């Protein structure tokens, strides 16, 4: 089962002239797979550890997480309309990641950019073959792929950090983040062209779940300071309270909801701690 929107509008076709047509408004859709039982179990273990550290008051200075980014532009042709991003679009996306994650001591450095014209890969066909050909670096390096369209009409998807990611394994090869090229800053995806799809998916890559994970019952996204949420948000519904029996309004400004890019603002302190816990456990 995939984390994805149940209500996805059809995208407007891009003209063959190379002009970047504005895509029709739609609901955010994330294609990241549900976390495995192992991953949820580890989230619970880390949550307990984080709570003990907070209770003890034994808070030590932590190092900044420095992430090398290998940016893979995968296009259907050598036009922006077909996914061939400019250098500025690439660096602007990295700048968004740095701005959004800086308060949480995570920094991104563009280690390299490559461009590939392959119609099938640009439309998310044969993911493993594409990544086997393009992937670079180690398990702590972020491989970020931009493509023209993704499976199930998602705007992006990512792979959670996990055990067993030995060099050359399928887990290692497929690791990374894929986003629609139209979602980078200056892209054509209406409502989602400020680069925040990248932030959302990198959040998954660092171990975070959707804020609406689990709905109004149970332990939800396994982070104690994100209010319970019955379902994903759409747009920027100020004051939404989909779990009235639980404390707090829906976290519509949280990067791990499905709000419009202009609505996104934050990660919580609990998500901040979880990012660092998962990094230390699996990627450091």
Curated annotation (Swiss-Prot):
Keyword tags: Disulfide bond, Glycoprotein, Hydrolase, Metal-binding, Metalloprotease, Protease, Secreted, Signal, Zinc
Annotated Gene Ontology cellular component terms: extracellular region
Keyword Signal among UniProt keywords: yes
One MF term in the entry's GO annotations: metal ion binding
One GO BP annotation of this record: proteolysis
Binding site for Zn(2+): 200, 204
Signal peptide span: 1-18
Gene3D superfamilies in the record: Collagenase (Catalytic Domain)
Major site of localization recorded for this protein: secreted
Family in the record: Belongs to the peptidase M43B family.
Protein name, as recorded: Extracellular metalloprotease VDBG_01143
């Amino acid at each position: 089962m995939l984390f994805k929107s149940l209500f996805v509008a059809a995208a407007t076709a891009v003209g063959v002239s190379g002009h970047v047509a504005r895509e029709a408004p739609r609901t955010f859709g994330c294609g990241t797979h549900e976390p495995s039982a192992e991953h949820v179990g580890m989230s619970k273990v880390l949550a307990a550890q984080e709570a003990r550290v907070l209770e003890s008051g034994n808070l030590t200075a932590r190092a900044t997480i420095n992430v090398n980014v290998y940016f893979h532009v995968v296009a259907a042709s050598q036009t922006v309309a077909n996914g061939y991003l400019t250098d500025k679009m690439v660096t602007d996306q990295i700048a968004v990641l740095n701005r959004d994650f800086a308060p949480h001591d995570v920094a991104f450095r563009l280690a390299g950019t490559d461009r590939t014209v392959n119609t099938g890969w640009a439309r998310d066909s044969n993911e493993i073959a594409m990544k086997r050909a393009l992937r670079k670096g180690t398990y702590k390096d972020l491989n970020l792929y931009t493509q023209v369209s993704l499976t199930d009409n998602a705007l992006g998807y990512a792979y959670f950090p996990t055990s067993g990611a030995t060099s050359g394994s399928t887990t290692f090869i497929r690791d990374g983040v894929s986003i629609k090229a139209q979602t980078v800053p200056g892209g054509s995806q209406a409502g989602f062209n400020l680069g925040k799809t990248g932030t959302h998916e990198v959040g998954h890559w660092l171990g975070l779940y959707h804020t609406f994970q689990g709905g109004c019952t149970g332990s939800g996204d396994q982070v104690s300071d994100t209010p319970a949420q019955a379902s994903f948000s759409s747009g920027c519904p100020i004051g939404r309270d989909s779990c009235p029996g639980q404390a707090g309004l829906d976290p519509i400004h949280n990067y791990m909801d499905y709000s419009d890019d202009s609505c996104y603002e934050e990660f919580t302190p609990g998500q901040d701690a979880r990012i660092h816990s998962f990094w230390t456990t699996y990627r450091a």
